[in-house]
Design a protein with these regions (language model features):
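A compositional/biophysical signature of low hydrophobicity enriched in polar/charged and small residues
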Residues: 1-336
């Protein structure tokens, strides 16, 4: 199974560039010069192309992607059931929290779905209860990750297929090492999570803000990646602008004794970008969640049906996003 990109004016170099920088953006003094050497073009050509791709909206931002849990944050998926005439109001209020990264309206009784991350000293239930007190909220369900089977997919802009992503530089597992965050670490994280400027020496800006050299900045970033605190430093693409316009969350009701088997099988499908086990409630029976991105609703439905037949689970629903209220990286260690 595969799904392809919409017709796009991008040339082959643009597509190859997007393929590379969404997973292996170089941590070097002049990163665009280093990229240019791989393609036999000038540094200014790469800067121009990446600037153009950002302007077009294909690249959302370029920054460090951190592991929420390694930073001491608690995160969860949350489903709100909201009166239809209050959806916009509630969604806008939810968006004000810096720990809300993704927020969508979906076609279901639970019509607002968002991810929430709270800091080490914050209580998620207090934050959620405050949100749930908003006018129009009927009820909500907290759906934290009980087990992770897959996270992340690299969109193949050349061939139109999703592929399994690789860590920066080479395949490796994070080194097992305890990480106790310091105030200085927080300073680094605040800088590394910012969108990188598209200029010849972009890393000079965060380095100067931290009062250090770029070499020291790179050493710290690579150390974070080595121990798994930073997943990667990369360009983040917008799925819709890249041609994957159908955002479908497939939820499955899987027998408890086979959930690990099914979760691991789901993780092998290239169309599945994320796969998690989550809790169930009396009014929510689905315990396995998977995300797919396709070029149309019909294509997504066909993908789901084919996966269903292969894994032998027919009790599932696809919750399509009808509106995107917010999609951005969590702003770590920023005050509400």
């Amino acid at each position: 199974m595969s799904f392809s990109l919409q017709t796009s004016p991008l040339d082959l170099l643009d597509k190859r560039l997007l393929n590379d920088i969404q997973w292996t953006f170089p941590l070097f003094e002049r990163p665009f010069l280093k990229i240019s050497l791989s393609y036999g073009v000038s540094e200014s050509e790469i800067i121009h192309r990446i600037s153009k791709l950002k302007t077009k909206g294909l690249i959302r931002q370029i920054n460090a992607i951190f592991d929420t849990r390694k930073l001491g944050y608690k995160s969860a998926l949350v489903a709100f059931s909201v009166k239809p005439d209050k959806v916009d109001f509630v969604a806008n209020e939810i968006n004000k929290h810096p720990g809300v990264s993704h927020n969508y309206e979906r076609s279901h009784e639970f019509n607002i779905w968002f991810t929430l991350a709270v800091g080490p000293n914050d209580d998620m239930k207090i934050v959620l209860n405050n949100m749930a007190s908003l006018d129009g909220v009927i009820k909500y369900r907290l759906l934290p990750t009980l087990k992770l089977y897959k996270i992340g997919v690299k969109l193949d802009m050349v061939n139109g297929d999703p592929t399994v992503p690789l860590p920066s530089d080479k395949v490796r597992e994070p080194v097992a090492k305890s990480f106790e965050i310091t105030e200085r670490d927080k300073d680094f994280i605040r800088e590394l999570q910012k969108d990188l400027k598209i200029v010849p020496e972009p890393f000079r800006i965060p380095a100067e803000n931290l009062g250090i050299t770029t070499t020291e900045l790179f050493d710290r970033a690579r150390d974070y990646e080595k121990i798994g605190v930073m997943r990667r430093f990369a360009a983040i693409l917008r799925h819709r602008e890249a041609g994957f316009i159908a955002n479908g969350m497939i939820v499955w009701n899987v027998p408890t004794d086979s959930i690990d088997e099914i979760g691991n099988r789901l993780a092998t499908f290239p169309e599945v970008s994320h796969c998690y086990r989550r809790p169930v409630y009396k009014d929510w029976r689905f315990n396995l969640f998977s995300m797919i991105h396709a070029r149309s609703l019909e294509s997504a439905k066909k993908i789901a049906l084919e996966i269903s037949k292969i894994i032998g689970i027919d009790d599932y629903q696809i919750l399509f996003s009808t509106r995107e209220f917010k999609k951005e990286r969590v702003k770590y260690f920023e005050k509400v």
